[in-house]
Amino acid sequence: MITTKELRNKFINYFESKNHSHQPSSSLIPFGDDTLLFTNAGMVQFKDVFLGIEKKDFSRAVTVQKCLRAGGKHNDLDNVGYTARHHTFFEMLGNFSFGDYFKKEAISFAWEFLTKEIKLPVEKLWVTIYASDDEAFDVWHKHIGLAKERIIRIDSSDNFWSMGDTGPCGPCTEIFYDHGEDVAGGLPGTPEQDGDRYIEIWNIVFMQYNRHADGSTTDLPKPSVDTGMGLERISAVLQNVHSNYEIDLFQALIKKAQQVTHAKDINSPSLKVIADHIRACAFLIADGVLPANEGRGYVLRRIIRRAIRHGNKVGAKEIFFYKLVAELVSQMGEAYSQLIDKRELIEKTLIKEEELFLKTIENGIKIFDAEIENLKDNTISGEVAFKLYDTYGFPFDLTADMAREKGLKVDEQAFLAQMQIQKQRSKEAGKFNVDYNSLINSQVKSEFRGYSTLIEDAKVLEIYQDGQLVASTSEQVSAVVVLDKTPFYAESGGQVGDKGILEGVGFEFVVEDVQKSGEAILHIGKLVKGRLNLNDELTARVSDKPRLATAANHSATHLLYKALKLVLGGHAEQKGSLVDENRLRFDFTHDKAISRSEIEQIELLVNQQIRANYPVTTIETSQQKAKSLGAEALFGEKYGDIVRVISMGDFSIELCGGTHVAYTGDIGLFKVTSEGSIASGVRRIEAVTADKAIRHTFTNENKIIAIKDSLKANDTNLIDKIKSMLEQIKNQEKQIAKLKKELLSGSSNDIKETSIGDIKIVVANVDGVDVKTLRNKIDDYKSKNTKVIAVLTTTNADKVQFVIGVSNALTTLIKAGDIAKELSSHIDGKGGGRADMAQGGGNNSANIDQALSQVEKFILNNIKE
C-alpha cells in the first residue's frame, strides 16, 4: 500500500522530472487578496501570474498546497465528520503551466501519472469535458486512446471555470474513478451523479479566454493550465477505501483522538471531526492566526470549539485537543517543517483556548437544553443562538451542530440580524484607504533606484486623475504620476511611502504618498505649479529627513524583533508593523503582558546593538540560500525568487525590501513608549528612535522633576515620599467613609419610615454621602427586616444617585428594577438592576422631594394591588 506521505512525494518527483519547478505551499492566509478569507486552491499563489501582473522565472510549476474551506463562500464545516470526503483543511496536488504547454501535454501528464506512476486501472477511469471543447475530446480520444463512451460532454458550469466575473477563464476536463458496482451512484451528468461510485479525482482547467465586463470573451495571448487533485481523495483510491477518513494519515489521528478522549466507539463521527479539525487548527496557528472574535481568528475559534465539544460528547473529561499535535507532527512534520518549528506555540494556544471555553461550555449547554425543553416547534430561535454566542462563546455552527443531533434547526436569519445589530453598535469609523490596484490598472514598469540615491532624473510615463489615464494635468489638481525610474519608496512591508517633489521646467508636483500597482510605482500628490505632461523630463527628489528617520525606525524594528525572540522566546512571531518618520509599531504573538523587567532587557539588547555600530549589509540571493543563512521572513510580505537579505552584524538577519540605515549606530537611541494587547494572544509595542527617543526621555525626566518639586523630594527619598502620601490618602479615604457612615446613621432619625402591615417602606434623600454608603445602608435595612422596601438618594449639584433594595420575600409584589424606572422618569435619569437590588442616577435634582413622593405612591399602589 502506498502511504499518503509517499504519494505526496511521488507527485512532486514526477512533475519535477517533467521540468516543473517545485514551489512550496503558500500560507493559508492569502497575501494581498481581500477577496479570500483563506487559501482554498493551488492556483491562489499564482493568481497574479495568471493575470499577467507578476512574472516568474519559470513557466511550469508543481505544488502541494495547504487549503482551508471553513468560512465565507467556501465553507465545508457543517459537513465535516458526517461525510466521506468533506474537510476543513486539505492538501491540493497541482501542476501549472504559465503560457507553456496546453491541453495535449496537460492531459498526457495526468494520464501518465495516474496509469503509469501510481498504476490505476484504465478501465476504472472516466473523463468529462466541456460540451463544446472538441480539442480536449480529440486529445482524449485520438492521442490518449480513450474510448468515446468514456468521454462525457457536460454542458454546464461544472466544466467551465472562471477566476471571477471578469478575467481569465476557460473549459476544464475532469477525471473520475469508478469505485465499482457495489457502490451506489451514477456517471457524471446523470441524475444519480451525486452518489459515491464515480468520484472526481483530478480537475484540469484550460485558461484560454479573457472574459470582459459585457460577458464577451477573447482569446488569451498565452493560454495557461491550472490543475488540482485532492491528496486525501486520491490516497483513498490507492489505499482501496471509500472514505478519506480511512486513509493512513487520518486513521493515525483518529486513533490518537480516541486515546485522549477515552471514546468507546472508534467509528464515531466525533473522532473524525477532531482528526480533521486538529489539522486545520495547527496549520492556521502555524501560519500566524490566533483565536479571536472576528475575522480569521474567529473561524479558528469556531473550529477549536467544535472539536472540543465533540471531544466532550464522546467522553473527554479534561483538556485533550492539544495532545493530538504530537501525532500530527509525526504524520506531517516532514512535509511541513513549520509544524515542528511552531509546535510549542500550537500546543500553548490550544491549551489556553480549551481552558477558556471549558469555563463557559457547561452553562451554555444548560441554556441550550432548557431552550429545547420549551420548544413549541423544531426551531431554536436566533435570539437564543445569539445569547449562546455572545455570552458563552458558542459559534453559530456549534449551536447548529448540537441542534442537528437533536433533529432540530436554528433560525439563522434571526441570528444574523442580532449579529448585525451588535456590529452596528460597536462599529467604529475606519480610516479610508484607496485601493490603487483596483483603481489604476497600470501596465508599465517603474525602476526603483531609491536604495542608493534620493535624487533621480526621470520621465513621465503615465498620469492619472480620478483613476483615468490623462495626457496632462494642471495646477492645483490632485493626480497620480508614474515614472520610468524613481528614488521614491512605495509603501510595502509596513514601511510608509516616501514624500518629496517632482520638479521640471516650469512645474512642481508635491508627492504626498507612494504606492504600487503591479510593477508601476505611483507618485500620489498635487501639482502646485505649472502643467505636467506625458513624456516630460523631471527630477524626482525624496525628502531626506523623513526618509532617514523612517530608515532608522525600520532598522530598529529588525533589532527589536530579534530582541523579542531572545527575551520572550521563539514563539514571538511578527504579526504586523508600521514604520514612519515619527515612530515604529510592532505587533507580535505573545499570550501575556510584557513585564517592566522584560521591557528593560529588550531596550538594553537593542541599544547594545546600536552602540556596537554594526554595518547594515545587503545581499540579493535565492530564497533557498536566504533560508539556509537563517533569514527571518516577515509577516504579510510577498517575496520573489530573488530576495533581499538585510544583516546587522551577527545579531539580525531578515528578508526585507525596505530602506535602512548604513550602520546600526545611525539609529541613535531606542526607547519603548507603550506595550499592550490588540487581540487575543497578540501584543503591540510602540517605540521611538534617535532625536524622538531623546525627547521622550527628556519629557519623562521633566515629569519626574515636577513631581519632586511638588513633593519637596529628591532622588533618594522620592519613592518613599510617594508611598507615604499614598498611605495617607488611603487612611483619609477610610476616615471619610467612616464619617459618611456616621452621617447617614445620624440622619436615620430624620428618615421617614412607613409601615403597611408587616412591610416597612423607607424613602429618603440623604446628602453628603456616596453610592457605596447608600448601598451599605440598604444592605443594613435588608439584613434587619425580612420585609422591607428601601429607596435612598443623594444629590450633588444637579446630579442624583440612588440605590433601591427590596426583600426577597416581596419581589413577587414589586421589583427594585421597576421602582428604579419610576424614579428615573422623574429625575431625567436611568437605572436598573435585579428584582431585589437596583441603582442608577439622573441629571435633575431640583424636584427630588417631589420625585420621592411619587415613588412612594408608586410603591404603595403596587403593594395594595
Curated annotation (Swiss-Prot):
One of its GO terms (cellular component) is cytosol. InterPro entries: aa-tRNA-synth_II/BPL/LPL, Ala-tRNA-lgiase_IIc, Ala-tRNA-ligase_IIc_anticod-bd, Ala-tRNA-synth_IIc_core, Ala-tRNA-synth_IIc_N, Ala-tRNA_ligase, Ala_tRNA_ligase_euk/bac, DHHA1_dom. It holds the Pfam family tRNA_SAD. Keywords: Aminoacyl-tRNA synthetase, ATP-binding, Cytoplasm, Ligase, Metal-binding, Nucleotide-binding, Protein biosynthesis, RNA-binding, tRNA-binding, Zinc. Transmembrane segments: none annotated. It comes from the Bacteria. Gene3D superfamilies: 2.40.30.130, 3.10.310.40, 3.30.54.20, 6.10.250.550, Bira Bifunctional Protein, Domain 2, Threonyl-trna Synthetase, Chain A, domain 2. It is an enzyme of class 6 (ligase). Binds 1 zinc ion per subunit. One of its GO terms (molecular function) is aminoacyl-tRNA deacylase activity. The keyword Kinase does not apply. It catalyses: tRNA(Ala) + L-alanine + ATP = L-alanyl-tRNA(Ala) + AMP + diphosphate. Its EC number is 6.1.1.7. SMART domains: tRNA_SAD (SM00863). It is found in: Cytoplasm. Its cofactor is Zn(2+). Zn(2+) binds at H554, H558, C656, H660. Belongs to the class-II aminoacyl-tRNA synthetase family. Consists of three domains; the N-terminal catalytic domain, the editing domain and the C-terminal C-Ala domain. The editing domain removes incorrectly charged amino acids, while the C-Ala domain, along with tRNA(Ala), serves as a bridge to cooperatively bring together the editing and aminoacylation centers thus stimulating deacylation of misacylated tRNAs. NCBIfam families: alaS. Catalyzes the attachment of alanine to tRNA(Ala) in a two-step reaction: alanine is first activated by ATP to form Ala-AMP and then transferred to the acceptor end of tRNA(Ala). Also edits incorrectly charged Ser-tRNA(Ala) and Gly-tRNA(Ala) via its editing domain. This is Alanine--tRNA ligase.
